[in-house]
């Protein structure tokens, strides 16, 4: 490749093993390669996230081409970083940590001056006292050398307001070029209150619909099975209660995790307790393939919901966290539960009766992708 080739970059790519994050990266790569066909695309992994090498190799085998770069610098050996990892949540000063990092490390980011545009990976970003500091500090460092920083649709937890004042967040998110696209109504409402100009879009994974339709259903599976894909390392009893209720309703249940590094130990324990099969797909494509052969997907993972939607199968969301709660509201889902322990035979019968309505609501939600941003350039 010639040294003077035009380049764009993706930063904060999450390669830790969540197939939803790999789907985000694939959607971004396909969108950007279509918009910038003559450009080299460099991908920088998230500075403080691990890399699932096996699933990353599978992603490289199946996905579009790109140049993988080394992680950008970040200092995780500071007193702040240690304090931020403690459950006691000592009083923290994240802004001071951000600018301390910028002062010490900004020269290392001069290489970003070579890019025509830089794109922040979509998804749930700026989370907590550690990751938010890492991301904001990185953006400030890059901004010194290149102000053309855009972001694919992302969401932010309301808890960020416990770390930063509103005017501070306005300044920090002001590092992003407009349009700032958020992927749900909850984040949009929070940004409106803070005076941060944004537009509501959809997770960029919705842009993979045509590709998803070409994926063959998984062989050797029974169509009447219910796929239970509920995450929660700290609520084992509730997870088991949900599985038991589905089994007691006379249905066949199989477990599936979209993020094996996080859920693997729990899903194996549940599998052993109930003597049921479990699956840990290596790719988002394999996940869609599994979802195409079932009667219902029960999940609290946002990308479980989105990939289930791409598979055009029925969904029962478990809205025990903000992301599925936002999905339920935005997609106007007729049935959901607040916790897996609230699943019961009566609810499942209602879901059966409303399968057509559920699938139609999901189709309507997907169709919004043609009218809303799934990237920072969709409507330009």
Regions found by a protein language model. Name each.
Residues 1-380:
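Active-site anion-handling motifs in enzyme catalytic cores
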């Amino acid at each position: 490749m010639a040294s003077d080739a035009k380049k764009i970059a993706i930063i904060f790519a999450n390669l830790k093993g969540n197939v939803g994050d790999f789907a985000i990266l694939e959607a971004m790569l396909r969108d950007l390669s279509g918009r910038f066909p003559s450009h080299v695309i460099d991908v920088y992994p998230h500075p403080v996230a691990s890399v699932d090498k096996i699933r990353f190799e599978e992603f490289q085998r199946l996905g579009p081409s790109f140049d993988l770069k080394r992680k950008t610098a970040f200092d995780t050996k500071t007193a702040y970083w240690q304090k931020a990892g403690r459950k006691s949540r000592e009083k923290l000063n994240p802004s001071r940590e951000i600018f301390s990092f910028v002062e010490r490390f900004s020269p290392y980011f001069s290489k970003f001056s070579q890019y025509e545009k830089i794109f922040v990976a979509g998804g749930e970003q700026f989370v907590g006292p550690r990751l938010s500091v890492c991301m904001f500090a990185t953006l400030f460092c890059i901004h010194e050398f290149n102000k053309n920083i855009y972001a694919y649709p992302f969401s932010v937890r309301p808890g960020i307001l416990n770390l930063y004042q509103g005017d501070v967040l306005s300044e920090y998110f002001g590092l992003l070029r407009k349009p700032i696209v958020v992927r749900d109504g909850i984040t949009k409402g929070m940004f409106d209150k803070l005076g941060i100009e944004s537009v509501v879009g959809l997770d960029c994974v919705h842009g993979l619909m045509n590709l998803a339709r070409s994926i063959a259903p998984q062989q050797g599976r029974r169509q009447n099975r219910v796929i239970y894909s509920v995450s929660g390392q700290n609520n084992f009893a509730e997870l088991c209660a949900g599985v038991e209720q589905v089994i007691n309703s006379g249905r066949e249940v199989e477990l599936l995790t979209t993020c094996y590094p996080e859920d693997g130990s729990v899903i194996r324990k549940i599998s052993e307790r109930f003597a049921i099969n479990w699956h840990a797909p290596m790719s988002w494509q394999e996940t869609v393939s599994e979802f195409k052969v079932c009667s219902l997907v029960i999940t609290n993972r946002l990308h479980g919901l989105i990939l289930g939607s791409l598979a055009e199968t029925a969904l029962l969301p478990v809205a025990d966290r903000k992301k599925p709660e936002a999905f339920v509201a935005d997609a106007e889902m007729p049935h959901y539960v607040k916790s897996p322990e609230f699943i019961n035979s009566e609810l499942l019968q209602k879901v059966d009766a409303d399968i057509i309505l559920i699938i139609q609501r999901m189709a309507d939600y997907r169709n919004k992708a043609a009218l809303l941003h799934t990237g920072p350039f969709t409507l330009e």
